[in-house]
Regions:
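Short coil/turn linker and secondary-structure boundary residues
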Residues: 1-4, 8, 12, 52-55, ...
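Generic N-terminal amphipathic, Lys/Arg-enriched alpha-helix
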Residues: 3-28
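Divalent metal-dependent catalytic cores for phosphoryl transfer on phosphate-bearing substrates
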Residues: 20-26, 44, 49-148
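A short, charge-rich alpha-helical start-of-domain segment used by transcription regulators
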Residues: 30-33
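DNA target-recognition patches
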Residues: 36
């Protein structure tokens, strides 16, 4: 599948990511949205170049597109997810950037109805990385760093 085909296929998701970021009221929401598009494109490129796997390439594009979906979520929304899911986490504003990855799967499942565990894990670990990362996790981690 070509990149343009994926951009068309996931136009609705892209629009929803844009609206989520815009609704945050954060002054950098447009920059963040453009970053997400860049990460999606880079992830697609890396998956094609290093794995030549159409399924992985599509997952890489989608994961890149939504990886910062929760970047500007308010503290009370994070705390609600933590409480509602009985997570053993205490929110700390000093490490806020870690939470948008860690808690993103909960928001993405509920708001975007994306349940692919491989995609959700790649998003969960895109900030910190971890040992024994899957190919998709590595692709999203590296794509995000390359697009800072």
């Amino acid at each position: 599948m070509k990149l343009i085909d994926l951009e068309n296929k996931y136009k609705d998701i892209s629009d929803r990511v844009y609206k989520k970021l815009e609704s945050s009221g954060h002054p950098n929401y447009l920059k963040r949205f453009n970053h997400s598009l860049s990460v999606a494109r880079k992830a697609f490129y890396l998956a094609n170049k290093h794995y030549n796997d159409e399924v992985l390439s599509e997952k890489a594009f989608l994961a890149g597109l939504i990886h910062d979906y929760c970047k500007y979520v308010k503290e009370n929304e994070y705390n609600k997810v933590i409480k509602d899911n009985n997570l053993n986490i205490i929110y700390d504003e000093r490490v806020r950037s870690v939470y948008h990855g860690m808690l993103a799967p909960y928001f993405i499942r509920n708001e975007l109805n994306i349940n692919d565990e491989e995609i959700l894990k790649a998003i969960e670990w895109h900030v910190t990385g971890r040992e024994n990362m899957s190919p998709l996790e590595k692709i999203i981690y590296v794509s995000d760093i390359l697009n800072k």
